From Swiss-Prot:
Family the entry assigns: Belongs to the papillomaviridae L1 protein family.
Gene: L1
InterPro entries, per the entry: Capsid_L1_Papillomavir, Capsid_L1_sf_Papillomavir, dsDNA_vir_gr_I_capsid
Official protein name in the record: Major capsid protein L1
Subcellular location: Virion; Host nucleus
Gene Ontology cellular-component annotations: host cell nucleus; T=7 icosahedral viral capsid
Organism: Human papillomavirus 57
Length: 510
């Protein structure tokens, strides 16, 4: 529509026909719903009752490189105890439902159950600071590549080499054992490999047990399967698996049982630079160098280094100090399911290996063959905990949730799920060993009550070491101090003795 030219106000109105187009945007369906994991704070009620639990002085002594076996029966006479091993303590707690509680009305045993929550921990470490040395009498070191050196064509260029490892301090607390990761030998496809080919690598998750070797600076590998010459790494790991905690998997655990919280401090630098002796498995590409007329083949270009953890200091210690658990990284906020917790410790700052000497023959003059030298390593621990008493009301919804999480918990609380009723009549023979009847089926093996019975841990039983007198223990006093509570000492006032009444004198008038 148009307005006249003589009009004062001129306006133009244009109309556009609507045009339909198909919807070109993608339609996204909602994701598949997943079961929601509840935090323990939702269905667990904390009380104001606290207990202290502590171990005795824990000591271990052994050889730092390998186990020593007797020649006769092949029995281990001296175990392997190294400062570069994991110490996984399996701490067993008393059942609070069988505990003598100060208040009988604290919970209802018909509908509720008691459990422990760890709220404080302190790992005490004895022994002085020191650096442990490891090595190999036949270490695969061909040349010192840090300095100029002509390639050595010897068939056996192994030498005596020793070194100190990467410095590690590690601390993991949970109600399940920690999960470790390492690279192992994978499986090759049929017909795709030949003798001498590089083995395929496979990422592997395993449970970290007590005595497993930590990652020392040579990688988290299965050295027994991936290094057949047994000389690429020192003696204490050349036939072992070095594991590294899988922090990613433990942090992604829906329940968070393997790691309530963790502390770690790692430190390393490279000290020496070597190359490996042997034939080169991967050919060096021609475009990476100009060929020489004097040297037909280049030297070994498989370079390696020796690690070093550098200086140890008391100012950088993670141990001998308390830690308080307010909020765990996962949904399990410190609940000790199954009345157990696992404490994983690594401390390479106290890895000193001591030398012991014994005399073979007595002579006046010194002769090296007259003495036998031995090597030992010692460790000392002291574990202290603060536990809070908690209660859980077992409603049908909570029981179903716990059954999906861990069915053994309800069985331990005498809330087992009854089996379905059987409509058929069962046959039971009297004499099972009699040859007059048909052969009976073997009895199925009983499932072990302890799911960790086949694993190796350092068992610490605290069943008889709980106490409510927190002010009588160092960690308990620290706990009371950070809560702002002071220990009270009740003193009874001495009973006042009744004084004998004084007889009044009669006034006598004179």
């Amino acid at each position: 529509m148009f307005c006249g030219l003589n009009d004062v106000n001129v306006c133009t109105i244009s109309l556009q026909m609507a045009m339909w187009r198909p919807n070109e945007s993608k339609v996204y369906l909602p994701p598949t719903p997943v079961s929601k994991v509840l935090s323990t704070d939702v269905y667990v009620t904390r009380t104001n009752v606290y207990y202290h639990g502590g171990s005795s002085r824990l000591l271990t002594v052994g050889h730092p490189y390998y186990s020593i076996k007797k020649s006769g029966n092949n029995k281990v006479s001296v175990p392997k105890v190294s400062g570069y091993q994991y110490r996984v303590f399996h701490v067993k707690l008393p059942d609070p439902n069988k505990f003598g509680l100060p208040d009988a009305n604290l919970y209802d045993p018909d509908t509720q159950r008691l459990l422990w929550a760890c709220v404080g921990v302190e790992v005490g470490r004895g022994q002085p600071l020191g650096v442990g040395i490891s090595g190999h009498p036949y270490y695969n070191k061909q040349d010192d590549t840090e300095n100029s050196h002509n390639p050595d064509a010897a068939d056996d260029g192994r030498e005596y080499i020793s070194m100190d490892y990467k410095q590690t301090q590690l601390f993991i607390l949970g109600c399940k054992p920690p999960i470790g990761e390492h690279w192992s030998k994978g499986t090759t496809c049929s017909g795709s490999s030949a003798v001498g080919d590089c083995p395929p690598l496979q990422f592997t998750n395993t449970t970290i047990e007590d005595g497993d070797m930590v990652e020392t600076g040579f990688g988290a590998l299965d050295f027994a399967a991936l290094q057949s010459n047994k000389s690429d790494v020192p003696l204490d790991i050349c036939t072992n698996i070095c594991k590294y905690p899988d922090y990613l998997k433990m942090a992604a655990d829906p329940y968070g049982d393997s790691m309530f919280f963790s502390l770690r401090r790692e430190q390393m630098f490279t000290r020496h630079f070597f190359n490996r002796g042997g034939s080169m498995g991967d050919a060096l590409p021609d475009e990476l160098y100009v060929k020489s007329s004097t040297v037909q083949t280049p030297g070994s270009y498989v370079y390696t280094s020796t690690p070093s953890g550098s200086m140890v200091s008391s100012e950088q210690q993670l141990f001998n100090k308390p830690y308080w658990l307010r909020r765990a990284q996962g949904h399990n906020n410190g609940m000790c399911w199954g009345n157990r917790i696992f404490l994983t410790v690594v401390d390479t700052t106290r890895s000193t290996n001591v030398s012991l000497c014994a005399t073979v023959t007595t002579e006046t003059n010194y002769k090296a063959s007259n003495y036998k030298e031995y090597l030992r390593h010692m460790e000392e621990y002291d574990l202290q905990f603060i536990f809070q008493l908690c209660k859980i009301t077992l409603t049908p919804e909570i029981m179903a949730y716990i059954h999906n999480m861990d069915a053994r918990l309800l069985e331990d609380w005498n809330f087992g799920v009854p089996p379905p009723p059987s409509a058929s009549l069962q046959d039971t023979y009297r004499y099972l060993q009699s040859q007059a009847i048909t052969c009976q089926k073997p009895t199925p093996p009983k499932t072990p009550t302890d799911p960790y019975a086949t694993m190796t841990f350092w068992d610490v039983d605290l069943s008889e070491s709980f106490s409510m007198d927190l002010d009588q223990f160092p960690l308990g006093r620290k706990f009371l101090l950070q809560r702002g509570a002071t220990p009270t000492v009740s003193r009874k006032r001495a009973a006042a003795t009744a004084a004998a009444p004084t007889a009044k004198r009669k006034k006598v008038r004179r």
